């Protein structure tokens, strides 16, 4: 891990108020990380819909911490200690975190009247959002 390059990347993303979007993952999550240059919001979407009737998550995690590593110790056990250290260093910077095993799709929208951005996350092929996150609020520095 190159700390100087990592800091430079964090600065670029935060100073531009860019949102990091990721898809085709196995979990839906939203994380907001504070940096000296402002917050960074990352949205991960579980776009692999194996069960079109799964409209409620089996598991919801709201605490960012070492349980990400310890929950699956069999995955790359040789890197477990390093991953624990990375999570430990990152945890104090996390202001908001939500993760769930819910496949679906997300829609980012901006309200024309108040210029507020929000994410609506729909379970499977649902017609009503299961989760709504105020992205504008997360992008406001604390």
Where do the protein language model's features map onto the residues?
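Active-site His/acidic residue clusters
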Residues: 1-4
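Metal-dependent phosphoesterase/phosphodiesterase active-site architecture
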Residues: 7, 11-19, 26-142
């Amino acid at each position: 891990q190159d700390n100087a390059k990592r800091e430079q990347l964090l600065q670029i993303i935060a100073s531009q108020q860019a949102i990091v979007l990721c898809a085709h993952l196995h979990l839906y999550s939203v994380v907001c990380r504070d940096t000296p240059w402002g917050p960074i919001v990352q949205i991960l979407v579980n776009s692999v819909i194996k069960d079109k009737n799964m409209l409620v998550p089996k598991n919801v995690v709201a605490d960012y911490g070492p349980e990400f590593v310890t929950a699956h110790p069999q995955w790359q056990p040789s890197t477990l200690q390093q991953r624990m250290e990375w999570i430990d260093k990152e945890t104090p910077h996390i202001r908001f975190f939500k993760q769930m095993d819910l496949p679906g799709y997300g829609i980012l929208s901006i309200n024309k009247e108040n210029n507020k951005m929000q994410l609506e996350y729909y379970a499977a092929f649902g017609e009503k959002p299961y989760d709504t996150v105020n992205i504008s609020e997360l992008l406001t520095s604390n």
